[in-house]
């Protein structure tokens, strides 16, 4: 049976895990790290760079490096590279393809099935877009799972049959969620979830960046915000300082040659204390309180009844965040999970559940936001309340607002505001062909169906005529199937190009290594070779040098093979010659040793005898 992986597609970093012998294993990437930066860059030569290599070149290539794209997924945002528009789905797919390649290299087999996680507070459009990103990357997306739910699954699977209440506090690079769950006998039931999709570690970084820009402007009168390359350096320095301040009381940010002024190059040297950092980010910390209180209220659970608190996301390592969680819950967070990996581990376990590898586990998730339609007066009429367990299906009967109304426009919204326009519009469709009738007479049954991925389907039916209309709700950002297929092919072509580039680079490296070894061999032992062999090597070496000066990879391969052959022959000749010389020398030495000692001994005896006489 084909393996399935679990993927935490994060704002800042992503992680992939797989079940091995029933136990989840986090897969290290090609660079040896267990997490991969969610950064994609387009090099000038057309190569697509992902992860650590993309991060390393960001300073010199800021316009063509994309990070934190997860914040844009499910919107109409795009980035223009070389006159081609890339959607958030396509950029996210590049990260997913990198994870897929690394997983396949580790497992030694092709991977198609995956469970991908999303923030619990993602709306329908964001979930759809994440699923599309997976499809573009070549995955069959088995399930979209909420990150806190995956974390609870990873935490709670081995906790036995005792019923317990768990709070998951998930503060990642770009999003924030709080979820309350109940665990008992393999059943993981989400009671409530709340969050903020625009709050995360990136915002803490931005406060440091703003502080550095303001400080530098005050000292030198130069606005670094106008310099893209300088801003990329500030971004990296801010992230590093934030991490340092989690362990140290101060962090020194020293960036030489950050820009140039009238008198020459200028340097940035600023020290930030932890207290100063916490002051400038206090309002961000305060924003964490609202979703926490909402989740507790919706669950109908007292804070004192929470038995375990799990921290998820790298941003929870900040001391101020840990302290806030202690204040809000009255208990120390659980230290037994890795906040960077626990979500991917949970996703792998859910993949195992869906594949039948993990038994006796039932995951009951909820929809994070209420769903409904717009009714007369612009009112938002809810059909499914937030925190309803999914999958679920609800129906309600509506009627017409005007006499002889020939059609009904169904506008679907997601949110909590009473006025429809203030909520997130998911889509619109029309039920046509209604027979003439006084207003209030037609009976229009509207049914909402949410699947286990949290993706919505809507169905409207005129009970009088039997006419009906169905739609899978797709936000304005969602892509038609043919676009997903086109993007998938495009991504595969890029992957093939990248593979070819890697192979070409490896061929060139191997050829250059042989060239160097052969030159060294000639310098050290060339005078010991027959003239004919030496001439053959020099001729083949010249061919390889010439090939390496061009771009024809086949020519390099051919020249490499020829040089390898003649070098090997010459090496064998030299080895045989040296063995013969060594054997002759050993024979002479053995003869000398056989006669020499006897002569010496005889002489000594004679001398002794003479002395005695």
Curated annotation (Swiss-Prot):
GO terms for molecular function: ATP binding; ATP-dependent protein folding chaperone; unfolded protein binding. Induction: By stress conditions e.g. heat shock. The keyword Cell cycle does not apply. Residues 567-576 have a biased composition (Polar residues). PANTHER family: HEAT SHOCK PROTEIN 70KDA. Belongs to the heat shock protein 70 family. This is Chaperone protein DnaK. It comes from Salinispora tropica (strain ATCC BAA-916 / DSM 44818 / JCM 13857 / NBRC 105044 / CNB-440). The gene is dnaK.
């Amino acid at each position: 049976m084909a393996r399935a992986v679990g993927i935490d597609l994060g704002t800042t970093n992503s992680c992939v895990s797989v079940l091995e012998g029933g136990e989840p294993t986090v897969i290290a990437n090609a660079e040896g790290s267990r997490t991969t930066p969610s950064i994609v860059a387009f090099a000038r030569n057309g190569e697509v760079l992902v992860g650590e290599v993309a991060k390393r070149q960001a300073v010199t290539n800021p316009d063509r490096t994309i990070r934190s794209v997860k914040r844009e997924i499910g919107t109409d945002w795009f980035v223009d590279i070389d006159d081609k528009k890339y959607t958030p789905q396509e950029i996210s797919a590049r990260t997913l393809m990198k994870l897929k390649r690394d997983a396949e290299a580790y497992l030694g087999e092709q991977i198609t099935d995956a469970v991908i996680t999303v923030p619990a507070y993602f709306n329908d459009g964001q979930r759809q877009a994440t699923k599309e990103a997976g499809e573009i990357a070549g995955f069959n997306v088995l399930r979209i799972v909420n990150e806190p739910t995956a974390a609870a699954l990873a935490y709670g699977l081995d906790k036995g049959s005792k019923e317990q209440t768990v709070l998951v506090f998930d503060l990642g690079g770009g999003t924030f969620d709080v979820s309350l769950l109940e665990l008992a006998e393999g059943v993981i039931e989400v009671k409530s979830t709340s969050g903020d999709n625009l709050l995360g570690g990136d915002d803490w970084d931005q406060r440091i960046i703003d502080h550095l820009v303001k400080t530098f402007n005050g000292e030198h009168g130069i606005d670094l915000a106008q310099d893209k390359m300088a801003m990329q350096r500030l971004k990296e320095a801010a992230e590093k300082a934030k991490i340092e301040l989690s362990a140290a009381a101060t962090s020194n940010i020293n960036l030489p040659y950050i820009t140039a002024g009238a008198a020459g190059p200028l340097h940035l040297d600023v020290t930030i204390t932890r207290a100063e950092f916490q002051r400038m980010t206090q309002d961000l910390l305060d924003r964490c309180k609202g979703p926490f209180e909402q989740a507790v209220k919706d669950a109908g659970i007292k804070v004192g009844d929470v038995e375990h608190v799990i921290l998820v996301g790298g941003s929870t390592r900040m001391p101020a965040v840990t302290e806030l969680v202690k204040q809000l819950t009255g208990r120390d967070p659980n230290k037994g999970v890795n906040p960077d990996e626990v979500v991917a581990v949970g996703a792998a376990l859910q993949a195992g559940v869906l594949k039948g590898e993990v038994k006796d586990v039932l995951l009951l998730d909820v929809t994070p936001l209420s769903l409904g339609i717009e009714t007369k007066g612009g009112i938002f009429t809810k059909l499914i309340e937030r925190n309803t367990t999914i999958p679920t299906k609800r129906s309600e009967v509506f009627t017409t607002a005007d006499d002889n109304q020939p059609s009904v426009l169904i506008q679907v919204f997601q949110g909590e505001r009473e006025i429809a326009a203030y909520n997130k519009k998911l889509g619109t469709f029309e039920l046509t062909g209604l027979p003439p009738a006084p207003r209030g007479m037609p009976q229009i049954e509207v049914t909402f169906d949410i699947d286990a991925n949290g993706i919505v389907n809507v169905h409207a039916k005129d009970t009088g005529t039997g006419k009906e209309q169905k739609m899978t709700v797709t936000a304005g950002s969602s892509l038609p199937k043919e676009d997903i297929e086109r993007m998938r092919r495009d991504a595969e072509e890029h992957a093939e190009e990248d593979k070819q580039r890697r192979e070409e680079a490896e061929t060139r490296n191997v050829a250059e290594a042989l060239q160097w070894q052969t030159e060294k061999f000639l310098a050290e032992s060339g005078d010991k070779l027959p003239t004919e062999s030496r001439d053959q090597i020099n001729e083949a070496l010249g061919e390889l040098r010439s090939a390496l000066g061009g771009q024809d990879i086949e020519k390099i391969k051919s020249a490499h093979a020829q040089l390898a052959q003649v070098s090997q022959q010459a090496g064998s000749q030299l080895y045989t010659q040296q063995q013969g010389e060594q054997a002759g020398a050993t024979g002479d030495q053995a003869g000398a040793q056989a006669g020499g000692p006897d002569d010496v001994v005889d002489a000594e005896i004679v001398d002794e005898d003479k002395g005695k006489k």
